[in-house]
Amino acid sequence: TLEQGHHKTNSAGVIFAMTLDDAPPPQWPASRRRSSRKPEAEPVWITQLKHAADQFLVRRGKGNTVIAGYHWFGDWGRDTMISLPGLCLATKRFAEAASILKTWAQFVSQGMLPNHFPDTGNRPEYNTVDAALWYVHAMDRYDEATGDLKLVRYLWPVLEDMIGWHLRGTRYHIHADPTDGLLHAGEPGMAVTWMDAKIGDRVVTPRIGKPVEINALWINALRVMDVLVSQEIAVPAHDYIKLAERATTSFERYWNPDTGC
């Protein structure tokens, strides 16, 4: 007999149940019902979000990563770093967050994080300007949530390598402009921001130059580095606050009084 709100399919001895109610279906084993029982003080919707988040946390070799979406997306650098605070830190999965940060650090090349890992197992692609900047942001969120200075010190060389390459220049003409400190990115035929759609060889949204959100991330990354330095992580290779302030001044130089931006 089915209760209201449930749908059951019995095939080869496997029972599937669906419900919007918080209580697990009565057909579930008692051990599963016990393991899924939420803390008394936790709202139902928080528990549901935690369960939904589980499906995106997966393994890559011996480490952890995040699947950008099912069924055809793999793990993407930008998506992984943007989602890490919500998937791992808000849910107190600190060990998995640390594993994700360490896993991706292994694939940093010329200061850049992979855009994504091809499903065919080929070499990762590095055609993104913001994945590395989101990595620095995720590292900052992890530091604030955990106070785990051991991991921060371990990954500090990676962070400095990222910033150093962006200052000197890396793939796709990504470099800090020496005249204003802002980050320039892009070259013909390449789409390196999140607006990365292409039709054949044609870039749908060409954004060669200094995209606004990229430079917001760049300034944030420089300020994060200064915050980490203040925790006596290591002797810095650059004066990060000076770099951040210069870029900030340049960022605010243009103001449109008609639009207020």
Residue ranges and their predicted role:
Residues 1-261:
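Acidic, mature catalytic/reactive cores of soluble proteins
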